[in-house]
Amino acid sequence: MSGLSGPPARRGPFPLALLLLFLLGPRLVLAISFHLPINSRKCLREEIHKDLLVTGAYEISDQSGGAGGLRSHLKITDSAGHILYSKEDATKGKFAFTTEDYDMFEVCFESKGTGRIPDQLVILDMKHGVEAKNYEEIAKVEKLKPLEVELRRLEDLSESIVNDFAYMKKREEEMRDTNESTNTRVLYFSIFSMFCLIGLATWQVFYLRRFFKAKKLIE
């Protein structure tokens, strides 16, 4: 029995529309929250590309009611220990800086006090790159229409993706060069070891031959 046949089904524009909606729509950024016990230190680390704007907002709740001299300290550093942002008695605020190189950045919260004090609740919302740009402010300054703002956002996002791929390609080339260099060194070391073993074996043969001749065990 032959089944009914008809024209092949055509895919609608839903996937493309969904992709455009994801790219053009506001990006969802979730804040990080954690509890900070008294006299403790917690740090968050993140790798960020060079020449990127990094912004953040933080809030540290104080449930001690001012008891125990509770103080909180926020410090942001790079891998070399350079301080990019520091705030004593931090409770709530914002920070911003621009990265000079691809690096590992560390955001540290430290709590100091005395007595039995409840843990502090720390909320951190950190953005970088396209997420950190204030497109509403850009639209006001440059007098852009809503569609132009979304196109600007898409352009920046596309540029960010291209830069990410370029960096990944560069890292892949560096890793390949490192592997080739390591393989070459291993090959040279293996050849050197082989010659050393051959030389040692030859020396042992001549040494044993002279020893046995001295003992008159062989002619």
From Swiss-Prot:
Chain segments annotated as coiled-coil in the UniProt record: none
Annotated TM spans: 186-206
Region (Required for interaction with STX17): 1-142
Residues in compartment: Lumenal: 32-185
Signal peptide start and end residues: 1-31
Entry membrane topology: Single-pass type I membrane protein
Stretches of the chain found on the membrane's Cytoplasmic side: 207-219
Region (Required for TMED10 and TMED2 cis-Golgi network localization): 147-178
Residues annotated as domain GOLD: 41-193
Short motif (COPI vesicle coat-binding): ranges: 211-219
Region (Interaction with COPG1): 204-219
Keywords, in A-Z order: Cell membrane, Cytoplasmic vesicle, Endoplasmic reticulum, ER-Golgi transport, Glycoprotein, Golgi apparatus, Membrane, Methylation, Protein transport, Signal, Transmembrane, Transmembrane helix, Transport
Family membership noted in the UniProt record: Belongs to the EMP24/GP25L family.
Functional description taken from the UniProt entry: Cargo receptor involved in protein vesicular trafficking and quality control in the endoplasmic reticulum (ER) and Golgi. The p24 protein family is a group of transmembrane proteins that bind coat protein complex I/COPI and coat protein complex II/COPII involved in vesicular trafficking between the membranes. Acts at the lumenal side for incorporation of secretory cargo molecules into transport vesicles and involved in vesicle coat formation at the cytoplasmic side.
PANTHER family per record: TRANSMEMBRANE EMP24 DOMAIN-CONTAINING PROTEIN (PTHR22811)
Descriptive protein name: Transmembrane emp24 domain-containing protein 10
